[in-house]
Swiss-Prot record:
Subunit structure: Trimers of one alpha 2(I) and two alpha 1(I) chains.
Protein name (record): Collagen alpha-1(I) chain
Biased composition, class Low complexity, residue ranges: 20-39, 98-114, 137-150, 198-237, 302-336, 348-374, 383-399, 553-564, 575-593, 608-635, 660-669, 679-703, 753-768, 823-838, 853-886
PTM statement from Swiss-Prot or TrEMBL: Prolines at the third position of the tripeptide repeating unit (G-X-Y) are hydroxylated in some or all of the chains.
Modified residues (Phosphoserine): S90, S556
Source species taxonomy: Eukaryota, Metazoa, Chordata, Craniata, Vertebrata
Tissue: Forms the fibrils of tendon, ligaments and bones. In bones, the fibrils are mineralized with calcium hydroxyapatite.
Amino acid sequence: GPMGPSGPRGIPGPPGAPGPQGFQGPPGEPGEPGASGPMGPRGPPGPPGKNGDDGEAGKPGRPGERGPPGPQGARGIPGTAGIPGMKGFSGIDGAKGDAGPAGPKGEPGSPGENGAPGQMGPRGIPGERGRPGAPGPAGARGNDGATGAAGPPGPTGPAGPPGFPGAVGAKGEAGPQGARGSEGPQGVRGEPGPPGPAGAAGPAGNPGADGQPGAKGANGAPGIAGAPGFPGARGPSGPQGPSGPPGPKGNSGEPGAPGNKGDTGAKGEPGPTGIQGPPGPAGEEGKRGEPGPIGIPGPPGERGFPGADGVAGPKGPAGERGAPGPAGPKGSPGEAGRPGEAGIPGAKGITGSPGSPGPDGKTGPPGPAGQDGRPGPPGPPGARGQAGVMGFPGPKGAAGEPGKGVPGPPGAVGPAGKDGEAGAQGPPGPAGPAGERGEQGPAGSPGFQGIPGPAGPPGESGKPGEQGVPGDIGAPGPSGARGFPGERGVQGPPGPAGPRSQGAPGIQGMPGERGAAGIPGPKGDRGDAGPKGITGPIGPPGPAGAPGDKGETGPSGPAGPTGARRGEPGPPGPAGFAGPPGADGQPGAKGDAGPPGPAGPAGPPGPIGSVGAPGPKGSAGPPGATGFPGAAGRVGPPGPSGNAGPPGPPGPVGKGPRGETGPAGRPGEAGPPGPPGPAGEKGSPGADGPAGAPGTPGPQGIAGQRGVVGIPGQRGFPGIPGPSGEPGKQGPSGASGERGPPGPVGPPGIAGPPGESGREGSPGAEGSAGRDGSPGPKGDRGETGPAGPPGAPGAPGAPGPVGPAGKSGDRGEAGPAGPAGPIGPVGARGPAGPQGPRGFSGIQGPPGPPGSPGEQGPSGASGPAGPRGPPGSAGAPGKDGINGIPGPIGPPGPR
């Protein structure tokens, strides 16, 4: 028959009792570590976590692949300025430049009058011969100082014995190239020093034949070097100049030898497999520890071997022009010099491009007259400046009439003159006899030890080292003490129901309420590792998640048993990746004002004030201080050539001690040069004889060829300061030189701090009216003084009587700039002039105060989870307890 309808659904039976807990299966094979994900940004620090029980050290995992380098950090705050370095010693003078082409022959001038003969000075003690010092760097060529007045020609001194050549030092082995140090602060460029006196001219050689230039005379024997002098005082260091371009990269050093691998520790016995306990509650994240104290700096390392000669790097940019140094102290007046001999006219300078007229500046009102400031302390001698631009040639002087002087009586013996420059080469002389070998001189005294230099700037921080290889696995720690047995668990659910007899199908009831969740069953065995998936591409970083709220602290459990002592620390894990750079910090508080910066270079000249009406003639003031001697006048044209004197008879060749020098005879004609003989024995020096009358100057020789620039010599030890000489007499004032072309306008200088008002001096005694002196050379422009306070408007005075027109007085020193007046009407725009030369760059200011550290930036998005590490070693098996609900976790035991 047909199939009947289905019966109602039966009532669900009671839940079955859980089966007994199974034992944990053996650990599966560790899976291969996956590729490292990108480094996520650093999250905010969490609350401090509770100390968990010390677990057994797991096996160290394999180090992950090194991730890509993080972004470059923001540039740090510039450090404070270092200790100023000591002033370097002056470099050796550069090689003498080529002689310029001979200028046009000038008209013969009138012969000068012979000056009064000076007194014979005492003969100085010959100093010991100094050792050759280490070669110093070649100094930069400075600005040519003003030509000093020519001194009186002294008598020709006896030629000293030839010096012994110094021993050539052995060439050192080339060491590894050292790291390039940071550049020190750039020294301030000083103003050119006062001109030194010109050396006395040597005796004149015989004139050559008409039309033929005279040959060059033989060079004199080298003099004995003086004793080393004391080192000079340390000068102030200038502001730091701009950093030059980085030098060439040094050669990489040889890789170090690999270290010995440590012995592998004994492998411990594996412990029995323990039952996995329930997971403990998640500990709170620990706070970030406070930074540790700064370590004591280590002792300085030993000095390494000298580096190999590196290849010179590209030439750095020209340094900025330093601020002009203060004027040096006034020198003692020199002795009255005899009129110098006519020099060679200089070469014609290169004609510069004509400057264009600048735009017409606005004429400001005249400022108030500044008060005379107190004289400042004498500044240190300036470093040698750079060579200036060659000046324009002066106009050709008028031809003087030939003089008709009467020969005067022979003068008294003059003071010993300085060694003159080598004269023109004379004709070859006869071959001289071969002298005997000289005795070796005593060894020179050792020089004084130099001042130790300042500590160099800190070197650049090294690159982070590569991740180290994980160390060997340590011995397994002792097993922990067995804990107390837990409390009896709650009664478990009833056991499984027995078999029931099949009853009639009942009526389907209403669905019952949802039953309570059953107790979780035992953990199953770990499955086999699945196949390794293909590493996908690195995804973009996710958005920054908001930090979660801190959870409430759970109730404290009952006190647990005292734990065992802490196990041995496990092997160090691999180094983590560098975190991303923090966000830019907030600007720091305004720092205190730093010390006043150095005075800047002189600013451009201010606008020319309006021409005032001539005032009444004032009363005669006290006599002014003695001015500096003016620059030497221009060298006049060479005088007429004198007639050649008859040759003197040759003297006999002597071997004995040197006799007294007789009166100078007439200069004889030089023979062809003979072969150089061996050095003769050093004779005892004889007494100086009276100087002969100076001869007439010979004709100008042709310019010699430029010699090869030699290697700079080693720097000698500082010489012992000699005795102070007697103060010289006041020399005659030199004629004012021609005004050179205007120099380039410098950049405006940094305004210096306002100076103190000068105290009012006591009135000096009324002096007699001085005579009008010859105008001295124009001095360098002074620094722009601070702006004076605006004066109160004066009451209108009654018009005074018109006085006689006064003479134009000497231009005074530039006073401090007055306050800026009201802006005048805009004048008509003048024609645009050609671009002028570029000014020097300003001095770099001192570094500002360091800013406050920035706040920590927001945490970035968490990166993807890394691969799961290999399972740890199995623990000891525990005692089978009654299956109960786990109790609360006890507090941690003491460490």
